[in-house]
Curated annotation (Swiss-Prot):
Family: Belongs to the binding-protein-dependent transport system permease family.
Name assigned to this protein: Putative 2-aminoethylphosphonate transport system permease protein PhnV
UniProt keyword annotation of DNA-binding present: no
Induction: Induced when inorganic phosphate is limiting; this is controlled by PhoB.
GO cellular component term, pick one: plasma membrane
PROSITE patterns per UniProt: ABC_TM1
Function: Probably part of the PhnSTUV complex (TC 3.A.1.11.5) involved in 2-aminoethylphosphonate import. Probably responsible for the translocation of the substrate across the membrane.
Transport among keywords: yes
NCBIfam families: PhnV
Superkingdom of origin organism: Bacteria
GO terms under biological process: transmembrane transport
Domain ABC transmembrane type-1: start-end pairs: 65-253
Length: 265
């Protein structure tokens, strides 16, 4: 740590705790209370109800949940596949070449998501590859936005795997495909699951690009939440936000648990 004295560490801990409560816990607590409130005209809600959650789990909101899960899993799995392939392929190049080629994957993370959405909308609104108004354009945008994080996680895991392990397998007569399937991928699996969890959480919460390109019938949860709050329906929007946070956290915890279990094998 940068702070060596016990009093300094204690003070830093207090400051960090206060910042966590103010900027993370309190906003979530306010959203939760808003989702349970009948009316909120004062400092605290005047009554509590579950009707907002009932509304959040029926009709269009339920369709938005299914759309978010479908888009999130499909985009994350494709990003994971491409991230693993790219990380494995870049190992064959020198350090300088790896650095420049890696920038291709990291570039989308440096561009605002709205700009990514606009670019994809303009590029694929007419032939020869027209995807505007279809699910594919949303999947493309999510893939572009999350691929950098998937590639980064997988590359980090691959760098921690000793090359001696693969060399031993090769010296024993294992083919490249056998080494990949029985040596490299099993060792890389914990990082792959962590990358999948991170990609899924990012996709589930993506709004900027999705707002510009989503077709009818594929409204995601963030878009549905924005639409509700934009119409002044704060309580239903808050309930849907809690549903989004809960589902995303549960999925991340499950995938991270799988990754931890695989890492212990």
């Amino acid at each position: 740590m940068l702070i060596w004295s016990p009093k300094g560490r204690a003070a830093a801990g207090v400051v960090a705790s206060v910042l966590f409560i103010v900027f993370f816990f309190l906003p979530l607590a306010v959203i939760l209370m808003s989702s349970l409130s009948q009316q909120w005209n004062g400092i605290l809600p005047s009554g509590f109800t579950l009707n907002h959650f009932v509304n959040a789990l029926h009709g269009a909101a339920w369709d938005a949940l299914l759309a978010s899960l479908t888009i999130g899993f499909c985009a994350s799995l494709f990003a994971l596949l491409c991230g693993v392939w790219a990380a494995l392929a870049l190992r064959q190049y020198g350090v300088k070449t790896q650095k420049w080629l890696s920038m291709v994957f990291y570039l989308p993370s440096a561009i605002p998501s709205v700009s990514v959405g606009l670019g994809i909308l303009v590029a694929f609104s007419q032939g020869p590859l027209q995807m505007n108004g279809t699910l594919w354009i949303v999947l493309t945008a999510h893939f572009v936005l999350i691929s950098a994080f998937t590639f980064s996680n997988v590359s980090t895991g691959l760098a921690r795997i000793s090359a001696d392990i693969e060399n031993v397998a090769s010296s024993l007569g294992a083919s490249p495909w056998y080494r990949l399937r029985h040596v490299t991928l099993p060792l890389l699996m914990p990082w792959m699951m962590s990358a999948l969890a991170l990609s899924l959480s990012l996709s589930m919460g993506e709004l900027g690009a999705t707002m510009m390109i989503y077709p009818p019938g594929w409204t995601t949860l963030p878009v549905a939440i924005f639409s509700l709050t934009d119409r002044g329906n704060i309580a239903d929007g808050a309930a849907l936000t809690i549903v989004l946070v809960a589902i995303t956290l549960l999925l991340m915890m499950k995938l991270e648990r799988i990754a931890k279990r695989l890492g212990q094998k």
